[in-house]
């Protein structure tokens, strides 16, 4: 009895070899695209989150933590502000005649000379910073009847009382202070920057002790401008043991113009002029250390790479820098739509095309073919369609960078207290610009991502249509990205389809003949193999049960006798 059941099972297996799908006279060819187990989510115009095989981050969100000393010339202010270095504070003498691309002011900087103020501090600081030099030329001003080179215990230069090295403090000689009237023409071809000041004594006694007159006056003129300053005598908060002050002013003399200085007291006179240069130099407040490295873009947080189009490290930048945006991340799709491969393809390992899912492990191309024929299964990439897609995507990042990177610096903007409304307006304008750029950046990236996904989908469809045109009536579109080929197609035949040399006329008669031999009922469901095999297995099982029942009935009736020998 067991022998009969075993023979029945062997018969079923033998019969199974003739089921559809195991016919050596047909083959299956599927087209598909690359996929990865875990893709990257990006935003497009039509979808906030769509998964792609690869994406590049466009927002630089961190700095190196140090300011690179190359290719820009960095001048570290250390303990000196730019204005202190300009005036010649004793502890800033090392900055005389220095040059820079970027002057870095530190929070620890301090003044260590006569207390002063600059009524237009921000403008002077910006003017000198953009000039990029502290180159100073001494001139021989003719001050008559007065004592020069005044000093103070608040401004020690070594053990001696001193003063700002670029300024000349004039006071009475004996008991007189004659009116000073000095001219200095500009016969050069460049602008000259003159720094001068007015002394405001603490008391009337200090005023007359230094300048004789109870009230002094200083007038500085050129052909284009005139400034008249009257000292304000009075007590002020004590700084470094002094209650008096010096106010610093500045005048630019154009080529061919002339500087005229008139004063009857309280004049802090210039010793010469600073050369004015035009350029892209600037100043930045930062406590980041100076490091030996190379970076085109500098922020107060430190240098950052400029290989991305956007950054959210700091609004203040110097050099060729990414555009500042509010977003922490913006991802640019550099791969195709990702549809991870299903882990199981049925109990007989059926293959599927791009309409169902992508293919993982296809590392030699983005698009390719899988086949199943009498020689087994195989896979190969289609390099031409892959290269077409890559060529169009390559350079996308560089084009975005070219559109957005600033080839100039975004300097700090400062205003005096009386210009508070202007400062508020400027801040509003800057914030609006940032909001606008942030929106534009998100829109630009979404458009590029949409284009990339549409492009890669289009290349897949082009390859599928190219294959369909080759096969014509020799194959049937299975609806899942695969073709059922109705003739024997070995590996060489599959290769000819891939490389475009397939001749459908050679196989036409065989394919048509096989088409007409289709069994009576052909299931179109994607689960037809499952249903066929389950139905066949049940049929075999029932056949065995019936046969076993017949044998047992015959034995019971005596029609069949079973002898068991030991």
Swiss-Prot record:
It comes from the Viruses. It is a single-pass type I membrane protein. GO terms for cellular component: host cell plasma membrane; membrane; viral envelope; virion membrane. It is found in: Virion membrane; Host apical cell membrane. GO terms for biological process: clathrin-dependent endocytosis of virus by host cell; fusion of virus membrane with host endosome membrane; fusion of virus membrane with host plasma membrane; viral budding from plasma membrane; virion attachment to host cell. Gene3D superfamilies: 3.90.20.10, 3.90.209.20. Palmitoylated. Glycans are attached at residues 24, 38, 54, 79, 142, 181, 301, 499. Binds to sialic acid-containing receptors on the cell surface, bringing about the attachment of the virus particle to the cell. This attachment induces virion internalization either through clathrin-dependent endocytosis or through clathrin- and caveolin-independent pathway. Plays a major role in the determination of host range restriction and virulence. Class I viral fusion protein. Responsible for penetration of the virus into the cell cytoplasm by mediating the fusion of the membrane of the endocytosed virus particle with the endosomal membrane. Belongs to the influenza viruses hemagglutinin family. Major glycoprotein, comprises over 80% of the envelope proteins present in virus particle. The extent of infection into host organism is determined by HA. Influenza viruses bud from the apical surface of polarized epithelial cells (e.g. bronchial epithelial cells) into lumen of lungs and are therefore usually pneumotropic. The reason is that HA is cleaved by tryptase clara which is restricted to lungs. However, HAs of H5 and H7 pantropic avian viruses subtypes can be cleaved by furin and subtilisin-type enzymes, allowing the virus to grow in other organs than lungs. This is Hemagglutinin. It comes from Influenza A virus (strain A/Beijing/39/1975 H3N2).
